[in-house]
Design a protein with these regions (language model features):
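Aromatic-lined, polymer-binding surfaces characteristic
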Residues: 4, 20, 24-28, 59-268
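Short, flexible loop/turn elements at secondary-structure junctions
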Residues: 183, 354-356, 369, 423, ...
Length: 611
């Protein structure tokens, strides 16, 4: 088997020199704590994940393969840095257990010959064999290599012959399976004649991903799936560099920019994403972006947030691969250069902050293509964070939430757009063929502004444009309030609904126009206004067994043109929201905040913010 896939023995041994310098000393401490915790838990076995599957846990084998991969990598790296027989022996045991599984296909994908679990296990096996080569008996090593051939290469080729769907899609399944299998096949090239064909097919399948990956490096499946996708892509890129001196993946479109995408949607280290995997992708392999492209912002982000979690025994390698891949000659600033308004045109997402690196006030908005993978009826949706706490939230809507839904809740969410911070009309969901876009963006001394066009998502003849304006103190650059102004134009008399979702406790005032949202640490004051009569109610719903949401549900009737203003502020808003529209434009007043818009041919344009 080819050696030195991600690093050779000399490189692993040289990592010991890093442990006395910052930040590697902290990374190594986290790695040792994780490895010590792994020793206190039982090894991962097929019996375990099958029992979990029988209790109804989805992806039990895939998660077990992922955890095994992380354990093998971290234990092996820690052993190479500071030789420890217990770490070495446990890594070998985890590897032996993995290779003894009867299948590397998750039971939830039992109609496939190969799946994500196959790739996770195959990569874990070949890297583990490589890094533990001298610690495994030759006969056992041969058995492990045979397991990769029988449980990964052969099933993968069978899946391609069966024209499996993931080979031709563009999203994370494509990259995880094809990149993981390309890496494993490349390592197995001297062991099995099928490896060359498997690698060729895997790389051919990845062309669909590269064709869809935009120059701005954004990913329409959100931060969690971005991490899953880019992690496997980078591991393959590093293997190509080490085994073939091939840098073609690193030179592909968008990869030099993609490291910035998750930073803008994880303010203060908390995900503000728009998908059903809203996680912070703080994976050790992501340091390869900082290493290859000298992205100081990526190194800062990972240094700042990846060590802030308690050690666990599950998941991928974080600290181990951070020790291996973090550049040691990159001067990382305490205040990275990040834009206070950032748009990603390829997917129609945008983010704004009063200041970086630790925003006091932050908002994110999402438009884009409603036909993408994991799309939701959340065109023009918004999220809001105040002092690190998410106050207006996009909740993940997965299988678990449906299981816990009451009948009344199910009826309410039959219009799934109601589950998001957006607007729907006539009880219609957002149209699957809609393509929205960010049409305006601006950062000024005392404001931030983006405007989003829903692209017909609310139905034929309905135009929905959402403005998100942040009022910022010109001297301190501290955010004061976020004003959301919705332009809704409809050629027919129809009911509209606007929803704002939160984890906090909502208290609606008697006038029905002002409210407070009390979070764990912060309270947000809300004021609502419209150019037509509206009704505002507070609803609550159960997301799953341990999480509930509250929402402000605004309803009204519209024919022609309607403006709705929603103001979110850290301080109480002294007066109700006033909206005045004229031939010249529109003015929104909330307390001492005054926002002026000028009229253009297609939509309003921000002209001034005063407070």
């Amino acid at each position: 088997m080819r050696r030195g896939i991600l690093a050779d023995a000399d490189r692993l041994g040289a990592l010991e020199q890093r442990t006395t310098t910052t930040p590697f000393d902290a990374i190594f401490d986290a790695l040792q704590r994780r490895c010590a915790l792994i020793l206190e838990t039982s090894p991962i076995t097929e019996t375990q994940w099958r029992a979990i599957w029988e209790r109804g846990r989805w992806s039990s084998a895939s998660l077990a393969a992922r955890a095994t991969q992380g354990r093998i990598m971290d234990l092996a790296i820690c052993h190479h840095i500071d030789p420890n027989g217990a770490y070495r022996d446990r890594a070998v045991e985890e590897l032996k257990n993995l290779c003894s599984w009867s299948t590397w296909v998750d039971p939830c994908h039992n109609k496939m010959s190969a799946d994500i679990c196959t790739a996770e296990a195959a990569l874990a096996a070949v890297v583990g064999i490589d890094w533990l080569w001298d610690d495994i008996e030759p006969s056992k090593r041969d058995d492990m290599i045979a397991a990769v051939a029988d449980k990964a290469l052969a099933p993968y080729l069978q899946a391609i012959e069966e024209e499996v769907w993931w080979h031709g899609c563009y999203h994370h399944w494509n990259v995880v399976v094809n990149a993981g299998m390309a890496l494993a096949a490349m390592a197995m090239a001297d062991e099995d004649p099928r490896a060359e064909k498997a690698e060729q097919l895997a790389r051919a399948g990845m062309k669909h991903f590269f064709d869809a990956f935009g120059a701005d490096g954004a990913w329409d499946e959100g931060t969690g799936y971005w991490g899953l996708t880019v992690r496997y892509l980078l591991l393959l890129a590093e293997a190509d560099k080490n085994l073939r001196d091939d840098m073609s993946i690193y030179h592909s479109r968008g990869l030099d920019q993609t490291g910035l995408f998750p930073i803008y949607f994880t303010p203060n280290g908390r995900a503000a994403s728009f998908s059903d995997m809203q996680t912070e992708p703080l994976h050790g392999a992501i340091y390869l972006l900082a290493n290859q492209f000298r992205l100081k912002e990526v190194a800062w982000w990972l240094d700042e947030y990846s060590l802030g979690w308690d050690a666990t025994t599950n998941g991928w390698s974080a600290a181990g691969l951070a020790m291996l891949f973090r550049p040691d000659n990159l001067e990382v600033p305490r205040t990275p250069k990040l834009d206070t308004v950032k748009t990603f045109p390829s997917i129609g997402w945008a983010a704004m902050a009063d200041q970086w690196p630790h925003p006091g006030l932050y908002a994110a908005a999402k438009t884009g293509d409603m036909a993408v993978n994991h799309a939701r009826s959340n065109m023009n949706a918004v999220q809001l964070q105040v002092d690190g706490e998410m106050m207006i939230v996009e909740f993940p809507r997965g299988r678990q939430s449906r299981e816990f839904a009451t009948k009344a809740q199910s009826r309410f969410y039959e219009v799934t757009a109601r589950a998001h911070n957006t607007i729907c009309t006539a009880q219609r969901d957002h149209q699957i063929d809609a393509q929205g876009s960010v049409i305006e963006s601006e950062s000024g001394k005392n404001h931030r502004w983006i405007a989003c066009d829903s692209g017909g998502a609310c139905g034929d003849g309905v135009q929905f444009i959402r403005h998100v304006v942040m009022a910022v103190d010109g001297e301190s650059q501290k955010g004061q309030a976020v004003i959301v102004l919705d332009e809704l134009t409809n050629g027919a008399p129809e009911k509209f609904e606007q929803t704002w979702h939160t984890r906090g406790k909502v208290e609606l005032d008697a006038d029905g126009k002002t409210a407070t949202i009390a979070g764990i640490r912060r309270t947000v004051h809300v004021a609502l206004g419209a150019t037509v009569k509206t009704s505002v109610k507070v609803k609550s719903a159960r997301i799953d067994s341990h999480c509930s949401e509250r929402l402000l549900h605004v309803t009204g009737g519209a024919v022609g043109r309607v403006l709705l203003a929603s103001v979110f502020a850290a301080e109480p808003i002294e007066q109700s929201v006033q909206i005045v529209e004229s031939e010249q434009g529109a003015t929104v007043t909330a307390g001492d905040i005054r926002v002026e818009f000028a009229r253009s041919r297609t939509h309003l344009k921000l002209s001034s913010v005063e407070f």
